[in-house]
């Protein structure tokens, strides 16, 4: 199908009305809108990672409550809704208040209030933000004769940067708590209140008085309220898949598999349909390229800092983690573990749930996130991630994929001898993690500290019909590493794998901070 016959992908467009009127591709989520606004609670909160469709959902609610029935022609809600009542809508976008101090935050909130005060009026004596919010809600109700809808998108945006700062967090949190406080007192005047964010509302303690919010984030009926399911993609995006397949010179089936490996895998409850990252998927269709769009759209500096703070190794990220339901609601500002941040930020997702133990299993959702995380962690093991480093890793991949482990190790030896070495290089674990990161970047199966009946293998990697059993030594010899493999009979652990087992003993030169020598036995 020719490109001009397809609807445009709405890259960066988060306004429902603009998408519909501009004839952009829209994945119909209006059934969830109907379910939510006719549900048991008039106060709802949704947590999802960044760029996952929260703002578009909020905008959809805005159009619905504004009574813009024409925009919903042909969508699920058109058949479900029998009454299209127009309500006054107060829509606040807190993403405008990132990286701010107290004065700037108050100024931004005042600016957003003033826009609606021009419509409904402002009492002269009202100076405080909460008084102005209260007055605004009551005036809108009085002037229209209808209850008011309040939509707050990315409510936690002003606080994310200062989450663990003892000085700034309480100050900004008090401003936000004050701004949101009228939502409970004004309950008789409110038809619906909807808030979105990344962190759970209970974690920031700014809704301590508003205890009637329904958190729909992990409820099964709303599992696919944001993101794109496999069914939605294959029913509504077949032409885009076929065009991408032609561009990538792959079959449709191969393209579907690549899309699944790279962008799928999210679950926000269990059981749940597989959910694709909408930002990455739409960008892939718009550009006809399978690139890392979501990870590249935001540098996870804060995440990397927290991983270091909690001493989380790359290999621990590569394996699954387990968590109780309460762990998802642990106070973020007093975080004692990395699980809440990894999950809410979209770097980990739910992969399984044991109902008896009430235990969730979490893991990296897909290939894009795995590669992105490892690339972000690499500078911590190579001092800096240079262009030469990227080239070397690519050449190593080609060598190993071609069965030339010796050539790959020579490339790594040469590269490590030319870069500034990091701290903490005088222990085997540093190089073990370095190998883990590099092999993970290849998209290959890799694990460290693999248990066997007689010990633990430093590194195990599987590629191209071969399974590499790798032992690392520091300041000794490659022969000593190989002797250790043979003494512990590591290959026997993998004898039933059906793969050719290759033993690799590697010694690192302590003074030169690179590979000293190695022995390979097939």
Feature map (PLM): residue ranges:
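Active-site metal-binding core of divalent-cation-utilizing nuclease and nuclease-like domains
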Residues: 139-144, 438-465
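Phosphate-binding site recognition
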Residues: 1-427, 442
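Metal-dependent nuclease catalytic cores in nucleic-acid-processing enzymes
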Residues: 179-186, 340-348, 436-440, 484-504
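Conserved catalytic cores of phosphodiester-cleaving nucleases, focusing on short active-site segments
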Residues: 435, 459-474, 488
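Domain-level recognition of nuclease-like catalytic cores that cleave nucleotide substrates
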Residues: 493, 499-522
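Structural motif
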Residues: 149, 466-468, 502
């Amino acid at each position: 199908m020719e490109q001009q016959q397809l609807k445009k992908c709405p890259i960066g467009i988060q306004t429902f009305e603009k998408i519909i009127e501009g004839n952009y591709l829209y994945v119909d989520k209006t059934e969830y809108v109907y379910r939510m606004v006719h549900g048991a609670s008039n106060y709802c909160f949704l947590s999802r990672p960044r760029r996952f469709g929260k703002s578009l959902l909020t905008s959809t609610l805005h159009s619905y409550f504004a009574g813009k029935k024409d925009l919903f022609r042909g969508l699920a809600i058109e058949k479900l809704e029998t009454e299209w009542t127009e309500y006054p809508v107060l829509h606040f976008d807190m993403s405008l208040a990132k990286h701010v101090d107290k004065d700037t935050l108050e100024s931004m909130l005042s600016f957003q209030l003033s826009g609606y005060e021009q419509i409904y009026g402002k009492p002269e004596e009202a100076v405080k933000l909460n008084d102005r919010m209260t007055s605004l809600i009551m005036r809108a109700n009085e002037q229209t004769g209808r209850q008011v809808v309040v939509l707050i998108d990315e409510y936690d945006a002003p606080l994310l940067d200062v989450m663990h700062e003892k000085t700034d967090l309480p100050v900004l949190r008090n401003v936000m708590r004050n701004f949101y406080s009228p939502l409970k007192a004004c309950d008789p005047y409110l038809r619906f209140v909807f808030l979105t964010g990344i962190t759970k509302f209970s974690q920031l303690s700014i809704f301590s008085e508003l205890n009637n919010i329904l958190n729909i984030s992990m409820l099964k009926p709303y599992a696919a309220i944001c993101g794109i399911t496999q069914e939605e993609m294959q029913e509504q995006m077949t032409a885009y898949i076929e065009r991408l397949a032609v561009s990538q010179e792959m079959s449709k089936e191969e393209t579907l598999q690549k899309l699944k490996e790279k962008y799928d895998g999210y679950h926000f409850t269990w059981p749940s349909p597989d959910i694709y990252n909408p930002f990455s998927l739409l960008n892939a269709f718009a550009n006809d390229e399978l690139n890392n769009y979501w990870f590249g759209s935001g540098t996870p500096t804060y995440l990397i800092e927290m991983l270091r703070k909690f001493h989380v190794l790359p290999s621990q990220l590569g394996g699954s983690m387990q968590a109780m339901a309460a762990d998802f609601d642990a106070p973020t500002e007093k975080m004692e573990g990395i699980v809440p941040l990894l999950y809410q930020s979209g770097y980990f997702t739910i992969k399984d749930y044991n109902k008896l133990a009430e235990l969730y299993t979490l893991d990296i959702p897909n290939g894009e996130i795995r590669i992105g995380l490892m690339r972000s962690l690499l500078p911590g093991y190579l001092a800096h991630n240079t262009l030469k480093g990227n080239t070397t890793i690519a050449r190593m991949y080609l060598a190993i994929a071609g069965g030339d482990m010796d050539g790959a190790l020579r490339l790594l030896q040469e590269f490590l001898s030319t870069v500034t070495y990091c701290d903490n290089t005088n222990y085997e674990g540093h190089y073990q993690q370095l190998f883990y990161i590099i092999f993970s970047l290849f998209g290959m199966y890799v694990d460290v500290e693999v248990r066997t009946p007689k010990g633990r293998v430093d590194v195990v990697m599987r590629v191209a019909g071969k399974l590499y059993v790798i032992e690392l030594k520091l300041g000794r010899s490659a022969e000593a590493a190989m002797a250790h493999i043979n003494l512990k009979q590591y290959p026997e652990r993998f004898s039933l794998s059906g793969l050719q087992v290759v033993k690799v003993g590697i010694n690192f030169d302590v003074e030169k901070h690179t590979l000293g020598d190695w022995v390979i036995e097939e």
